[in-house]
């Protein structure tokens, strides 16, 4: 398991990836060519992957995402050390916080 700030990145075995993912729409890259895993609401900084890969959002209000890195990749953020990931599949999960009456994603 990898962690960068409020983002968890969990390896997933290829055989455990749901079959619908192959045909699911892929998330677009930002203007800088990155796959954005999470955007900071306060700073505008992003947890993002540079290099080849695909990102698929799973159903639900908070994601999670499935990330495929066929050649491996790096997760970067302006305020955290970069993380190098080996090739493979990953589930990307945003940390959540409980506020009486609701659950929300942690503000980064």
Where are these regions (language model features)?
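Short, surface-exposed, low-complexity cationic segments
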Residues: 13-42, 90-103
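Short acidic, Pro/Gly- and aromatic-enriched capping/linker segments at domain boundaries
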Residues: 1, 50-78
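Short hydrophobic/aromatic patches at helix-to-coil boundaries
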Residues: 105-108
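Tight coil/turn sites that cap or link beta-strands
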Residues: 70-73, 78-79, 85-97, 101-102
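Domain-length accessory/inserted modules outside core catalytic folds
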Residues: 32-33, 37-54, 59
């Amino acid at each position: 398991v990898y962690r960068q700030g409020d983002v968890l990145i969990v390896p997933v075995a290829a055989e455990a990836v749901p079959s619908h993912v192959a045909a699911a729409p892929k998330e677009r890259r930002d203007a800088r060519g990155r796959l954005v895993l999470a955007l900071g609401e306060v700073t505008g900084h992003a947890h993002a992957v540079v290099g080849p890969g695909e990102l698929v959002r799973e159903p639900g209000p908070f994601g999670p995402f499935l990330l495929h890195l066929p050649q491996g990749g790096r997760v970067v953020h302006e305020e955290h050390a970069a993380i190098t990931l080996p090739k493979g599949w990953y589930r990307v999960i945003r940390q959540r916080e409980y506020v009486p009456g609701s659950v929300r994603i942690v503000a980064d």
